[in-house]
């Protein structure tokens, strides 16, 4: 059972870890600033720490009672930080080592979901250019090519021809991790947040881009977010149950966000799970929480409570 904390002093000294050295560093800094301001507004003794490649040194220099982690991507969302904090016996928000590591790796997440009978688009790992023809035969076109361990759609490309597939593989292979192609799903994109085991309202995403890429997420002013999502109550509840099951299968706890697509026939497809979603006041989890009647300050309080789990 999740613990409820009524007094700010019970949290003790809180380190808000942000930044990191991954490609999502700037987004993490924005998330960290928003979280820090909200925690302090709630009377919590919190200190922001801009972490570089050395995640541990700042925590050894000063004593903290717990960590609010908003480092996105590698180093902060992949189990590395979670393992280090476990060794230091410093409680942290969100998922533990195993769930963080699994969720950061999109390929292994898909393997877990497939093994549990959950729907995720067919895919093929691309280890070299020699796999591209096999990809064409197995998946057809179009496909979306992804680095397995990057967030915010970094390194992703849609490919509708053999030439585009080769270019997409070249781009994705530059991120130092496995690369895979996934069958393109023509449909509507949703994202579903989870807070302490309870689903948040779904958000429907609408963008003129080919897909919800980095520009659509952080730069474009043409992206539209619909919450309520427009589905009837029963259908939304079905997708929310799928979101919770997707989290459960990979062990995500505390809070997180699952991205999914619903094709033209109504079939849902799980895409990925985020264990440290964006936390600016314009990010998706805060947006969904607001629709559920939870303001930003209350949201960060609830997330910090997950460090007691």
UniProtKB/Swiss-Prot annotation:
InterPro entries: ATP-grasp, ATP_grasp_subdomain_1, D-Ala_lig_Van_CS, D_ala_D_ala, Dala_Dala_lig_C, PreATP-grasp_dom_sf. GO terms for biological process: cell wall organization; peptidoglycan biosynthetic process; regulation of cell shape. GO terms for molecular function: ATP binding; D-alanine-D-alanine ligase activity; metal ion binding. Keywords: ATP-binding, Cell shape, Cell wall biogenesis/degradation, Cytoplasm, Ligase, Magnesium, Manganese, Metal-binding, Nucleotide-binding, Peptidoglycan synthesis. Pathway: Cell wall biogenesis; peptidoglycan biosynthesis. Mg(2+) 1 binds at residues 259, 272. It catalyses: 2 D-alanine + ATP = D-alanyl-D-alanine + ADP + phosphate + H(+). ATP binds at residues 136-191. Its cofactor is Mg(2+); Mn(2+). PROSITE patterns: ATP_GRASP, DALA_DALA_LIGASE_1, DALA_DALA_LIGASE_2. Residues 110-305 form the ATP-grasp domain. SUPFAM superfamilies: Glutathione synthetase ATP-binding domain-like (SSF56059), PreATP-grasp domain (SSF52440). It is found in: Cytoplasm. Its main location: cytoplasm. Belongs to the D-alanine--D-alanine ligase family. Cell wall formation. This is D-alanine--D-alanine ligase. The gene is ddl.
């Amino acid at each position: 059972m999740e613990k409820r904390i009524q007094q700010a002093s019970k949290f003790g000294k809180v380190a808000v870890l942000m930044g990191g050295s991954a490609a999502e560093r700037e987004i993490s800094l924005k998330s960290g600033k928003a979280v820090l301001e909200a925690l302090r507004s709630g009377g919590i003794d919190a200190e922001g720490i801009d972490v570089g490649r050395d995640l541990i040194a700042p925590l050894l220099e000063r004593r903290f009672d717990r960590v609010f982690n908003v480092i996105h991507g590698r180093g902060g969302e992949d189990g590395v930080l979670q393992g280090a904090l476990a060794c230091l016996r410093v409680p942290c928000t969100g998922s533990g080592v195993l769930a963080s590591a699994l969720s950061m790796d999109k390929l292994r997440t898909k393997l877990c979901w497939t093994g549990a009978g959950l729907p995720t688009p067919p895919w093929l790992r691309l280890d070299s250019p020699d796999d591209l023809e096999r990809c064409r035969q197995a998946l057809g076109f179009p496909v979306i090519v992804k680095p397995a361990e990057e967030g915010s759609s970094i390194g992703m490309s849609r490919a509708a021809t053999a030439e585009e597939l080769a270019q997409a593989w070249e781009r994705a292979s530059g991120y130092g991790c496995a690369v895979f192609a996934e069958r393109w799903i023509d449909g509507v994109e949703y994202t579903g947040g989870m807070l302490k085991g309870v689903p948040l309202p779904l958000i429907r995403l609408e963008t003129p881009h080919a897909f919800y890429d980095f520009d659509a997420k952080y730069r474009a002013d043409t992206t539209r977010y619909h919450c309520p999502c427009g589905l009837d109550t029963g259908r939304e509840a079905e997708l929310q149950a799928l979101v919770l099951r997707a989290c459960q299968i990979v062990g995500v706890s505390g809070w997180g966000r699952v991205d999914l697509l619903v094709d033209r026939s109504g079939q849902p497809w799980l895409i990925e799970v985020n264990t440290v979603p964006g936390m600016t006041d314009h990010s998706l989890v805060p947006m969904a929480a607001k629709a559920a009647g939870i303001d930003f300050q209350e949201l960060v309080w609830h997330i910090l409570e997950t460090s007691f789990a």
